């Protein structure tokens, strides 16, 4: 562990002591194996149940040994000591740092099984459907060996199938699907309609991706309601505007500003006197802003693709199509109009929850990732989670070459192609990590012009993902991919069957090339980690240009001088240090955004807990009827002839409708407040303090408003043996609902809504 001495000092002594204790327990576990091997399956399973009875483990060493012996019997996989150590740290609630290819799937299953034997219900959270289904089926024999049940959740399952799956002791599911089920369950009016049954523990695969990169991505449940969609005329007029003449874009390409000339052109072609008129500020101006953002800032094959006449967003952190994501506030419709497609229906947000708040619902959370160390501060700050570093089973043999830095993007791109061609000429397999679909396809085209066969993995063909990755380590393979995080399939040298393993080892193993630095070193390391698996040789190399986004953004306002050679290469440690500085600046910016966003979101998360508790009481007791009868005794007396169960359910339907409606209105109000909160600084008010003041004030009256509204409805609505006829009062719940994730909005400033930009489209 000497290589991580700096890490333990930075983190404090507790993690170091835990690591030493874990290593000692794993060493002791080996002493139990011979005795346990002699037991039959029934006796072995019973021994584990005895050790974990009462919700705690009496002998950790023997317990780990039992899990290991069972793994070998059921899966043919004997865990390495490092894997057993990781299992122990997960059971004790840490995030474990395990390198790619070190066997996280088995570790997660062993930990889930151990926690299940302790009587805990476990959700094993993955980043996509494929991994959830694969891992549940792969690990099923181990889990069922101990008499525990296991199931998986996927997007295409209906409510009945989900309800049955959630009854299992261990449930594998994508984080978004689990979150959507939480939201749907917040609309039920009968307990038996709930699909989830609660869980005690979340084991999170790719923990840094879920807990850091996507922590503040809102999951949304929406119902039918028209939204802010740009009219066709506005889309056509905006399409005619010229950059730098009619509008300008800031250096980060996150904001677009109309010039006076552009505003005048819009007013003339739309036949209006001023975009500032009251009649246009909340309608035409919003639609112009949406259309302009869609036209100028969202680029096809970078931010989205078009497939089967639909706009599909690209998840930047995973490099694949995000089937369930869409942009908010009419921006989705604006992009569809820009592409000449049918414009999708708008909707009212009924409820929303961030991934960070979702994970906060679990009494215990732990996780695994190959890049936990780099996320230590965020995990500690936002989740109070500790990181345990698990040493590799074999020493790392990968060679990480120093960055090759070029003066211009064009010079860098030529050098990348030359390097790939050189490596390919030897037969060494090459994996190239790009940042978006457009870049991956342009690079593949350039390589094919050199008669180099290329496999491309990006958002357009992610259905072929597992096969492409599995063969990426074969002789002569060149694979060009977007973001590799969460791909879930190991790259084995010599191909999926490792038939040419020895020859690829002689060639130097897998060569990984990054076409640019990412916004954080952690993402760079996710790509690097694809080479050098399980002690294999490998190479990693990043190409950088002074035109790259991370350099331009992180070095904003700074100047640097360098002397490139004839090819544009800048061989200078000083410049490499400066590029590293630029990356650290962008990392700091991301952390600041996360901190600010969490400060705004946390109060709403706390208020959600109060709403949830109120909802639970209304669902599970006769409280709704009792409160309505107390406030309107005469009306209650009129209904005495009805069955008590009918009266109580009618009360629930009425009370829950108005509680849900008022909560939805509160979310909409606070979103509007947040979008304009930056204006408070002009009035010398602290924006965050003012936001909290408004949130507390508005929420204080929410419960009473919901009760008052419910009492009013109770007095007027028809209630008979069929229940409360809310539809007749115009109080029907939406006839259709759908779920989606709000994309990490490239356009948002202090808030989540594109509408916040309407004050900034004029300089």
Curated annotation (Swiss-Prot):
Cross-referenced PROSITE patterns: SECA, SECA_MOTOR_DEAD
CDD domains (alphabetical): DEXDc_SecA, SF2_C_secA
SMART domains linked: SecA_DEAD, SecA_PP_bind
EC number: 7.4.2.8
GO molecular function, one term: protein-exporting ATPase activity
Annotated compartments: Cell membrane; Cytoplasm
UniProt keywords, alphabetically: ATP-binding, Cell membrane, Cytoplasm, Membrane, Nucleotide-binding, Protein transport, Translocase, Translocation, Transport
Entry protein name: Protein translocase subunit SecA 2
Source organism: Corynebacterium glutamicum (strain R)
Gene of this entry: secA2
